[in-house]
Amino acid sequence: MAKPRVYELAKVLNVDSKTVLEKLKDMGEFVKSASSTIEPPVARRLKAEFAKDNAKGDSKPVQQRRPAAPSAPASTSSSAPTPAAPARQASPASAHQQAPTPGAPTPRPQGGARPGMPTPGRHGQNDNRENGRDNREGRENGRQSRPNDRRNNDRRNNQGRPNNGQPVQHQNNRGNASAPRPHAQGGAGANGGNAASNAIPRPHAQGPRPGNNPFSRKQGMHTPTPGDIPRPHPMARPTADNGRGGRPGRPGQGQGQGRGFRGGRPGQGGQGGPRPGQWGHNRPGQGGGSQGAGQGGARGGFRGGQGGGNNFQGGGAPSNGPARGGGRGGRGGAAGAFGRQGGKSSKARKNRLAKRHEYEELKAPTIGGVRIPNGNGQTIRLRQGASLADLAEKINVNQAALVTVLFHLGQMATATQSLDEETFQILGEEIGWNIQLVSAEEEDKELLQQFDINLDEEELQDDEDLKPRPPVVTVMGHVDHGKTRLLDTIRKTNVIAREAGGITQRIGAYQVTVNLEGEPRKITFLDTPGHEAFTAMRARGAELTDVAILVVAADDGVMPQTVEAINHAQAAKVPIVVAVNKIDVPGANPEKVRGQLTEFGLVPEEYGGDTMFVDISAKQNLHVDKLLEAVLLTADAELDLRANPDMDARGATVEARLDKGRGAVATVLVQQGTLHVGDAIVAGTSYGRVRAMLDENGQPMEAAGPSTPVQVLGLTSVPTAGDLFLVASDDRAARQIAEKRQATERAAQLAKRRKVVSLEDFKKKFAESEIDMLNIVIKGDSSGSVEALEDSLMKIEVSDEVGIQVIHRGVGAITQNDVNLATVDKAVIIGFNVRPNRQVADLAEREGVEIKYYSVIYRAIEDIEASLKGMLKPEYEEVVTSHSEIREIFRSSKFGNIAGVMVQDGEVKRGTKCRILRNGVATVNDLEISSLRRFKDDVQSVKEGYEAGINLGTFNDIELGDIIETFEMREVERK
């Protein structure tokens, strides 16, 4: 059913739209304008409220405003009764000739509405009946004057009713010109539906839809008209007597001619109007036509009169009886047609769902004119970066309602905008829900479970499926303590020669074979950077490793990055083997290193602890085999290194880069299962199919088991170092997982960017807007290097006046898009081990974009720090340059007073700032030496010990003995 609009209801209720809007506001409903739609339950409540108001307004007696019609005693004879009041003839001509007299009823117009009555519309036929008059005294008089047993009188009088077709004179007790329904005469029959006018109106419910009535000419819903203007229905017209009676109500009682009118409502006086549609047929609830004179009132109570006809009882009271209060007409049955037969027309039956919905609406709190179901403290879980649309779907409410509630809480957001956790908590407290945002790990698990991937169940493996795997060893320590040299010695390679600046700037993964007691054992090594900028890399390496080798130089001892490496290993609960390196260097003191590490919980075995210390020299290859043996012994003693090689591969991304010829290349470490060429994999937000696998020496591989580092080719994009990878069932599933992760990550970033600015923080935010920002675009050869460089640059703190903002970072060569982005945002491009092609370099030169190239990370940090210092606003300090004593004053009509001075110290220059000191007190500041002469010559400066003439422009207040002090403002370097 279509939702009605406010102006439509105003037309139905015969009031203006403003009155309806005020009534809705009093009812607690939020409606914006007259063209707004409202729900059907609200419309029914509104009609009921107006009905109550009309009942209260019409409850005063109306007999004081009009004379009551005289009544005549009822006649029990079978002849036509004498009317109780002067009656008019039923012919149309007599209706126009007679004039109303005091004390007599006003004649009613034929075939249409009475004067002053509103034009009936489709929506207003049932509702206009509620404008009837109420007169309790008249109703009591009617009750006293009627017989005690009406049914017996009906049965006796029906046998003797005349059937000669003569018009029946009837009385109209309605003195008011306006009436709720139009009335007309029904041919030659009598108006048997006339009722008393002094009854109490009752609000009635709208009947069933016309589509359920097989006897109605209008089926289905109301067809809208232009402007939704109600069209009048045809009224009853005088018709000839066709000899048909009304619809039978009870068999065995008299024959009626003509058509009766519908009985009045309970407590409502007056004649009932005809029903549009079936002319000449009466339905249950309509007064049946009867032959003979007299007024037939409708039956009282809630049951309407019954149709009259051949030997059937009419719907009105006996012809010789007094008028009674009209009853509510009942809806007729369809006799086997649609739905239940018969039934009362009070209200359509509500199913349980509708009743429950209304009950919940009553319980729901009203916030800002909308109703939200109260959660009563129930917990609901949302993902990171969720929006109001997600919350509305969870709690089954309208999105616009949540937007309205949030607006009334002082925050503005759209339905699809990502919100932070604080905003959700405020909103949840208001509507009674405990909103919790799940962590990224739990959200990723729920995402994988949608694709039948359960990581928790896969970790629970049977012992029969587990097989031994090589240990993963991470080499950690301070920069330049010999980590890479140790790996070169083990692998018999020279990796350190290929590193820029002699320091490691990426994680290297290798696998070597070591003979332990004549048995070949494999060990996987991860070489982590030791520079302070690579903290994230070291932490990631500690999470992937089984055993950590802590390399400490015997000559330097414990350094800051050494302590950091210890903290990473202890946080990951990884056993540590200490390698005291450079024991061949003069000044080496291994015992000092042991004593320093004891303070951090690493107690050597010789001191009664459980940490193995090995003194080595990686450069001279001394005791390296003992170190490897200690690593294997520690792994065998403290760890259970087993994995299932038969399951789908799971692991972590160690490093990733963008190769010009091969695309995205990711170095991954397989932790569970076996990775094969052709598998569909997902690594973070990247996905693809394994086209090729290479080992650390560049040799192709077909399969990689647990604890095996390999380089994977075939990903669509460069993953982030540290992302977990897994094998999906097919390419489609891999793509869907990656795309959903991208959407989740993007929503989480948008939620972080959205910051709610309160009035307290407004000044702080305004001050931050005045900070000069250095925009930077970072491009590097690997994701780990880019991450380390970004973290290092963001840690630079020069002053509160300047800051750094990384607007873009990526892996690969510098492209045209990077230059365009830097042009718009006035940014500087930093290329870390990458270069642009010729066309991109020319474009950057034309656009004036600065590109800086670096291969060592600490040089990039130093240059950016210097650039930030150069962006600082200059600071100036006052520097006194000279003092000159006034010894003579020369007065000139053209130049004013001229001071003859002796320069005591410094150098006086023309155009410099000066002040006058009189008795050690500065009388005037911010003066300027406008002219400077040495005798008659204009000079630029005069040095100490010389005389000069100084003119101070328009300032003439000088005296002998005053001191002219010159000064200048010099810029001071910011630190």
Curated annotation (Swiss-Prot):
Protein name: Translation initiation factor IF-2
Record's keyword terms, sorted: Cytoplasm, GTP-binding, Initiation factor, Nucleotide-binding, Protein biosynthesis
Renumbered residue ranges of the record's region G3: 527-530
UniProt region (G1), positions on chain: 477-484
Comp. bias (Polar residues): 167-176
Homology family: Belongs to the TRAFAC class translation factor GTPase superfamily. Classic translation factor GTPase family. IF-2 subfamily.
High-level lineage: Bacteria, Bacillati, Actinomycetota, Actinomycetes, Bifidobacteriales
Gene that specifies this protein: infB
Basic and acidic residues bias (residue ranges): 47-59, 124-157
Pfam families noted in UniProt: EF-G_D2, GTP_EFTU, IF-2, IF2_N
